[in-house]
Amino acid sequence: MIRISIGVNRRLRYQFSSFAGYSGSENPRLFKTLGAANTPIPHRRNPEPKGQDLDFVNVAHSHLIQSDWDKLNKLSDHLDSFRVKNVLLKIQKDYLLSLEFFNWAKTRNPGSHSLETHAIVLHTLTKNRKFKSAESILRDVLVNGGVDLPAKVFDALLYSYRECDSTPRVFDSLFKTFAHLKKFRNATDTFMQMKDYGFLPTVESCNAYMSSLLGQGRVDIALRFYREMRRCKISPNPYTLNMVMSGYCRSGKLDKGIELLQDMERLGFRATDVSYNTLIAGHCEKGLLSSALKLKNMMGKSGLQPNVVTFNTLIHGFCRAMKLQEASKVFGEMKAVNVAPNTVTYNTLINGYSQQGDHEMAFRFYEDMVCNGIQRDILTYNALIFGLCKQAKTRKAAQFVKELDKENLVPNSSTFSALIMGQCVRKNADRGFELYKSMIRSGCHPNEQTFNMLVSAFCRNEDFDGASQVLREMVRRSIPLDSRTVHQVCNGLKHQGKDQLVKKLLQEMEGKKFLQESFNN
């Protein structure tokens, strides 16, 4: 296959700057950026098929037109990339036939495909607005190809662009596919190269890129990219602006989020419930609950009704701040305006009251949940079990564990941790350790907090043998060890005259960065 290279410098980092303006359209000509500094689109002359190659192309074309796949199958052994390419060029006006032949050649003789054959079918599909099919082929190439292949795909499309009388949407599809695959460097390169040749991606593809960036926590880059979109006169849509609001909120720039909300009308858009919910969540995250309530009240003035997400966000904010009366008040308002609470609503309130130790209120919300036919999940029961175990009411907690079977729910790590905590509160460390073993047998994984609860419970009972057994489990599972806990266990063992056990325990901890000298006196 011909090795392709171009003289455009590849950007391996962002060069995004300030923003301005408008653009973006389905009309291919409007993908062109203004100005005359664009690099000309190159054109490569490809050799025409001759002799046996020409005969093959003509015969294959005839069989394709007549849908005579039996005869075509007999030609499959003679396929190569040059012949496949020229057949695809000959039938490119029929995208269905092109795709059918492309897939047939891939199945019958995979070695007959090259980047050039892929490029031609991609041009054909995008010209006919079959973007999902094009992106499916691109995804297959980019995921299953070699390490250096992504960098070559743009070049292959570029050098066949004029030959196929293509449209900029072929590069747009490449950019969007890189975005969906979270290949951010390749997406950046494609964006910068598109600009070099006078093309811009659609706002939908830009949204896909920003969404992937935000999904990976790359808020700073997403916001810089938005500024570059505006500088390139790519007009945002409401989905874009809601993502930018989310980015501002996640980076703590709440004032900028509010400014953008106010600017939406100037940009030709009405704020949506998503816009307000995003800002409400941002303010709740920062503990600015009064401001969050004001935003909820602003929704009505804007002709929007708070929905279940709005109320759930506020309830979660108040519960996290342990302002449970305010959370209950929001719940009451929610029901008053006929917004139906869901599983998330009840779970948040049940968990909040359980954390506070008010099991009666938690159980009241649980009963209301049952009466209203709201689906309970493992989080519902874990919250109730946690609240009961926190108060050492392990028998009542066990009743809810039995409820899990009736609801076809399986205990998870949080369920076992709560039950272990209950036994530790009751100073039943041995029973807690038995629950730990059941937890492991069930395939659940305890965390550092669970182990430390068990160690503390054994130490309170002055059962340092049991505590050392838990420490060994922690070492075996590479759970971080707290030096004060280790000192406490080892000193307890020494006071009981179990120096050999201390020595053995410290040997097992070798390499865990604990100083043994302090235990040798």
Swiss-Prot record:
Residues 1-38 form a transit peptide. Pfam families: PPR_2. Its main location: mitochondrion. Signal peptide: none annotated. Disulfide bonds: none annotated. Transmembrane segments: none annotated. It comes from the Eukaryota. This is Pentatricopeptide repeat-containing protein At4g26680, mitochondrial.
